[in-house]
């Protein structure tokens, strides 16, 4: 197949209509050299200008020769080239992470809106087979996407519908590590996939079709559940078990750093179905937070000293704390405040958040704040943000949610002042 034939195939997909500056990832192998020659030949038709990004991994004697050739080619054709040198302990994952971080930096610094890679149809089939062998979720059988968001723009794979054998054979370098059976992809490419083809000559096309159908199925599910308030427990639990399963899967996909095992997924689903309020650790400082009416996955941010500090409000000196303004006043007739706390002492009032063992005196008995919050069915966030008012070491009030709980005064107490409280957001 000629580059003209390839151009005729991909021009209908309008990959580059929104782009002017395109960065090409070039290793020096046959696939990326095909991509470089193709995009260079059709720059005018595609209305783009191109640049080359190359990573010298320094793992083979040929690495420097590849870099030198690409620099010479770029100079001859007046194409900008950007080169990085891999650092650190080498592994497939580390090298891939380094490459894409480098590509992202160049896109941002040099104002490229698209990164283009040379993945083709055979890469897609290999990827699907690898994921099947690993036991990946259905969602991941959708395989490699032709276009996806990346850095400041998009990552485009224009050859993804073209097989390797359909590509021309330009001058290129051979990476002999591609023959090493130490790498899973190489075992799939040279052994497992050929075995499948011996059973079914159309195995590659079948795997690609499976990928396409999986993608359509997931898109249909997303379209049908779009706008569903699944964070609300009543809405989530109103769905069938099958829909709940895929809703949670879809939600977890929004947390790329949170790769959990299937057993952990099943545990999360079970916890949500139980509807028991609480904070449930997952991994990597993420947790599942179940409130009275909803659930959310969030990253746990350690409380700072500022969050934990207490403040003291003295007679005649207003103070802001926890989203409220507190005013300690001897004017017992002042009106128009959100909350009014009677004070039977002129000693300063300490404002703080709850602590283990806190109790509020309610007359003939006292109650732990923990039990008070449970009985009031307050959310975990409301409990964490609750404000405790203390005078002379005794809790005199608690603000939690939209409720205020007061210490029961004795019959001998005489009101000497009031604590006026107003929400700052109204001011």
Curated annotation (Swiss-Prot):
GO terms for cellular component: cytoplasm. GO terms for biological process: tRNA modification. It comes from the Bacteria. It is found in: Cytoplasm. Keywords: ATP-binding, Cytoplasm, Ligase, Nucleotide-binding, tRNA processing. It catalyses: cytidine(34) in tRNA(Ile2) + L-lysine + ATP = lysidine(34) in tRNA(Ile2) + AMP + diphosphate + H(+). Its EC number is 6.3.4.19. Belongs to the tRNA(Ile)-lysidine synthase family. The N-terminal region contains the highly conserved SGGXDS motif, predicted to be a P-loop motif involved in ATP binding. This is tRNA(Ile)-lysidine synthase. It comes from Streptococcus equi subsp. zooepidemicus (strain MGCS10565).
């Amino acid at each position: 197949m000629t580059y003209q034939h390839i151009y005729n195939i991909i021009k209908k997909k309008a990959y580059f209509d929104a782009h002017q500056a395109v960065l090409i990832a070039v290793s020096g192998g046959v696939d990326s050299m095909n991509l470089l020659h193709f995009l260079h030949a059709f720059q005018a038709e595609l209305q783009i200008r191109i640049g080359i990004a190359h990573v010298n991994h320094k793992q083979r004697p040929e690495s420097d020769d590849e870099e030198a050739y690409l620099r010479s080619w770029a100079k001859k054709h007046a194409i900008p080239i950007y080169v990085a040198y891999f650092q650190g302990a080498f592994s497939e994952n580390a090298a891939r992470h380094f490459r894409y971080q480098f590509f992202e930096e160049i896109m941002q610094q040099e104002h490229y809106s698209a990164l283009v890679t040379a993945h083709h149809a055979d890469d897609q089939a290999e990827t699907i087979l690898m994921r099947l062998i690993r036991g990946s979720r259905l969602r991941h059988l959708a395989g490699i996407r032709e276009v996806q968001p990346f850095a400041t723009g998009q990552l485009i794979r224009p050859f993804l519908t073209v097989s390797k054998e359909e590509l021309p054979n330009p001058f290129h370098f051979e990476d002999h590590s591609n023959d090493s059976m130490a790498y899973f992809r190489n075992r799939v490419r040279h052994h497992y996939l050929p075995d499948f083809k011996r059973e079914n000559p159309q195995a590659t096309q079948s795997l690609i079709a499976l990928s396409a159908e999986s993608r359509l199925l997931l898109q249909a599910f997303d379209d049908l559940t779009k706008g569903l308030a699944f964070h609300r427990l009543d809405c989530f639990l109103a769905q069938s078990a099958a829909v709940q399963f895929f809703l949670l899967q879809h939600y977890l996909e929004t947390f790329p750093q949170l790769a959990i095992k299937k057993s952990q997924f099943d545990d999360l689903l079970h916890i949500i179905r139980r509807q028991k309020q609480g904070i449930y650790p997952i991994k990597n400082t993420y947790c599942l937070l179940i409130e009275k009416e909803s659930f959310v996955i969030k990253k746990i941010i350690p409380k700072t000293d500022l969050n934990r500090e207490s403040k003291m409000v003295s007679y005649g000196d207003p103070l802001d704390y926890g989203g409220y303004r507190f005013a300690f006043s001897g004017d017992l007739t002042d009106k128009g405040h959100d909350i009014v706390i009677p004070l039977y002492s002129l000693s300063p009032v300490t404002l703080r958040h709850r602590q283990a063992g806190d109790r509020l005196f309610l007359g003939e008995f006292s109650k732990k704040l923990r039990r008070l919050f449970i009985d009031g069915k307050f959310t975990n966030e409301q409990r964490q943000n609750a404000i405790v008012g203390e005078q002379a070491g005794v809790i005199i009030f608690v603000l939690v949610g939209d409720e205020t709980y007061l210490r029961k005064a004795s019959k001998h107490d005489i009101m000497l002042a009031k604590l006026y409280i107003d929400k700052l957001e109204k001011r």
